[in-house]
Amino acid sequence: MAENGCGQFEINLLHVDDPLKAADDAILFKQVVKAVAARRKLTATFMAKPFGLQSGNGFHVHCSLLDKDGNNVFDDGSDEGSDILRHAVAGLLKTMSDCTLLFAPHVNSYRRFTPGTLAPNNVSWGYENRTAAVRIPGGDSKARRIEHRVSGADANPYLVCSAVLAGMLYGIENKLEAPEPINSITYDEAELKTLPLDWLSAIRKFESSDVIDSLFPSEMIELLIAVKKQEAKRFAQQVTNLEYLTYLQDV
């Protein structure tokens, strides 16, 4: 249960067949944890990177797809999974950079994307590869599923689930083909496309995307862009203590 960071814990929520309830459960869990911690004069945080030299906090989403009879359409009895699984993976990879703002919505979110910390920073997938952005876990083929590993714990669960589902649907409907899976450490693969690795780049990528308009309502897109630009402007106007320590007397 304990994770790499000091005072850090991994919590697995029960799988449910309703994405909205899954997001509700994530919000309720965060509220309960914060309330219990406060009663004991402690602070529980879901910042993506609360401590610069320790592990960040991720929000990994596991997703299966069932047909009307309850059969897992990602499973075809093989170790690799079905064609539909690979189409879904391809859709997630295609939309990943454009949706990074949803997976990493704050300035602090991008401190988590550090090579060597098991937080993905490129567009990649693989079987049992914990350095990839999209991982296909091993185990019983009947439980074949996709693990989306990009989001930080600070992300909005409703927007994350929406982006994951929309990406999978985009790939399935367009029958996109996934590239070859990565079996090595993805940080060492220089040819992989990197995600937007800073907040402003993610905002610009989301705003200029030719895919986002087909995934989300225009009102939501416009509002999110406006809010994030306003938030980014406020942070840009702040002078940090590190700047004072570095420059105040030395320039």
Q: Where do the language-model regions lie?
A:
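Short coil/turn segments at secondary-structure boundaries
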Residues: 1-4, 103-108, 216-222
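Histidine-centered active-site/metal-ligand motif
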Residues: 2-3, 15, 60-62
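Short, conserved phosphate-binding/catalytic loop or strand-edge motifs used
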Residues: 3-11
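Short secondary-structure capping/turn micro-motifs that flank functional sites
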Residues: 6-7, 53-54, 222-223
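A broad detector of the eukaryotic-type serine/threonine protein kinase catalytic domain
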Residues: 14-18, 211
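Active-site capping/gating regions of soluble enzymes
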Residues: 19-182, 187-192
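Acidic, glycine-enriched catalytic cores built around paired aspartates
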Residues: 186-251
